[in-house]
From Swiss-Prot:
Assembly and oligomerization: Part of the 30S ribosomal subunit. Forms a bridge to the 50S subunit in the 70S ribosome, contacting the 23S rRNA.
UniProt entry keywords in alphabetical sequence: Ribonucleoprotein, Ribosomal protein, RNA-binding, rRNA-binding
Source taxonomy: Bacteria, Bacillati, Chloroflexota, Chloroflexia, Chloroflexales
Keyword Repressor: no
Name under which the protein is recorded: Small ribosomal subunit protein uS15
Species assigned in the record: Roseiflexus sp. (strain RS-1)
């Protein structure tokens, strides 16, 4: 589901590389992870919501591609991000 403005600002502040960074792979993956977690909770309550399930799969795919990009560019940042977000890889 959509993130509230203050939640999004807090996530960006936690993962940004510099004061105006809003688009680095680390920030994007963190935001996608929060949206994915919200959709997972939604689907636990509404298991037949196939439209949201498709959106979840698209978000997971986008996050996977961003993580692959980050792993190819900066292995150390990739490992640190996975540890802080608690992702399996």
């Amino acid at each position: 589901m959509a993130l509230e403005k203050d939640e999004k600002t807090a996530i960006i502040a936690d993962y940004q590389m510099h004061s105006t960074d809003t688009g680095s792979p680390q920030v994007q993956v963190a935001l996608l992870t929060e949206r994915i977690n919200g959709l997972i909770e939604h689907l636990k309550v509404h298991p037949h919501d196939h439209h949201s399930r498709r959106g979840l799969l698209k978000l997971v795919g986008r996050r996977r591609r961003l993580l692959a990009y980050l792993a190819s560019r900066d292995k150390e940042a990739y490992r640190k991000l996975i540890d802080t977000l608690g992702l399996r890889r």
